[in-house]
Amino acid sequence: MPIQARIPRTLLLADAAWRLGPGALARYGWHRLALASGQAARRLAGAAVPGGAFLADLPLSPAPPLLQAWQARLRAALAALPPARHHGPFDPMAPALGMDLFRPGDVRPVWEAGRLACLPRLAQAALLWPEAGHRAALEARLTAWCAANPPFQGPHWACGQEAALRALHLALALALLGQDHAPASGARDFLALHARRIGATTHYAQAQDNNHSISEPAGLFACGLLLRDAALRDHGARALSAALARLVAPDGGFAQVSTGYHRLLLDVLAIVEWLRRRHGAPAFPAPFAERAAAAARWLAGLVAPDGVLPRLGHQDGSAFADLALAGPDDARGSIERAMRLFAGASAGFPEEPGCDWLALPAAPAFTPPDFWRAAGSMGWRRDGARALLRTGPLRFRPGQADLLHFELWDGATPVLTDAGTGAYNPAPADRWWLEYFSSAAAHNTITFDGREPMPRAGRFLHARWPRLTALPDGAALRDANGHRHARRVSAEGRLWRVRDEVGGGFSTLALRWRLGPGEWRATPNGAAGPACISIAADAPLTLRLEEGWESPAYGQVRRCTLLVASAAASLRWIETEIGLG
């Protein structure tokens, strides 16, 4: 690459680094130094494959009473387990630290299989049908996985967070089987190896200021708890509470403004809290309880009656510790579990089978507020509809250029939606996903002169973050190009209004509304279909329906419909009315 081409990218990286702050940069620097010096690798030297039994031959407790439909779901899940040996295009014998996790292909599906979500499922099956051989299948699965993945080699050992989630799944499975207080030797060796792996790259986890910073100390806590290592347990507890204090605001907003990663946050917190109570361990240091409850209430206010969440922010399809077997598209089990544990309330899903497995008592119903504001977002509820606005402040790096993005749901029906994620490392023919799904054009907001408000500086990194300010009924931003955009939201019954006021030196602008599923047709003032949308402005507008793209699930992309309003520089405001049926 010629030096002239490198200069702009270097400037973008410098800008992004300045915004991340000295603390994150210092921690990442320590991580790189530990890798380069061999210190991290030395911490992982001399490891052997677990050789003893993973499960003890102990009597099984009866399973909770469960509907036949749920039991059929478990049978289907067991029939679709991934193979124990699954490395995708990655070398299973390569040293895990420093592996190239991008050039060979997308590591995300490989890691999903390596989280061993099958362990709690096999434990559930063993309790439901004790004569069907599922306990032996769980033992065989762990033996086969360890043989296929020697310690600290291959993609499944490349990430501390993945090691933590895998250890948590084993801890949960052992607890369901009643074997977590005195694990068998193979399970103890397995947990000890995972604690070593997590501990080898803690500076990296802390530098991320995202779910890594939560999951990895949670994994250390669980390993210490089951290994009866009080020092490791307490270290994990302190680090987890410190991360929660930094990354979850008192209002429940998470540093990663993403419904998918917020769900993963709650799932991880719920499992370690349940394990802590089960073992009678000391409470997590403050402000763990307060922040966990606030985070649970934030997501409870967004879930649809069928468990679907808005696709706000990055979505990787995680459904961690999914005892309800609901999958990534149904978050009811995650939210109900977290609400009962942390808020002492129900999210409105009292017949939740995952809570039955954990023997969580029923709780009074939680009523979400009609209006709320949290770090990074604000929302409204009116007459069965829910709205969400992506706001500031930008204390942590934004994953997508989704500022002032607005979503609207009518019950379980999405009316205005987010485009989703695509994939983190798609196939060469689909590389356009990386730019498209993270762009402002993939969100319900305004772009000026066809330019992005934040240039991308890396796969998960943007530079030149806009300045955001809060408004009583919305938020406003000013980007690095001098463009100004203020968005205000109001509702009267079933009629919603979004008023956009703009300024700055622009020649053209485009307002995009990404329409939910259904038959939409153009009208003189907008579009009609599952809702009636009309757009007005103080200057002439060009309105059209056009085809776009959305990602309903990780790795999946399909066509969708957009309503686009275009205008010239003389425009100062646009008002959109959405009438719900």
Predicted regions mapped to residue ranges:
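Alpha-helical membrane-targeting segments
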Residues: 2-50
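Short coil/turn segments at secondary-structure boundaries
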Residues: 29, 157-159, 208-213, 308-316
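Extended, charge-enriched "interface" segments that sit outside catalytic cores
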Residues: 29-101, 108-113
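Residues that flank catalytic or metal-binding motifs in active/ligand-binding sites
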Residues: 114, 216, 376, 404, ...
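Residue-level structural signal for beta-strand termini and adjacent loop
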Residues: 392, 420-421
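Aromatic-lined, polymer-binding surfaces characteristic
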Residues: 94-292
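Carbohydrate-active enzyme catalytic cores, enriched for enzymes
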Residues: 253-415
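CBM-like, beta-strand-rich accessory domains located in the C-terminal region of large
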Residues: 164, 322-324, 328-333, 421-581
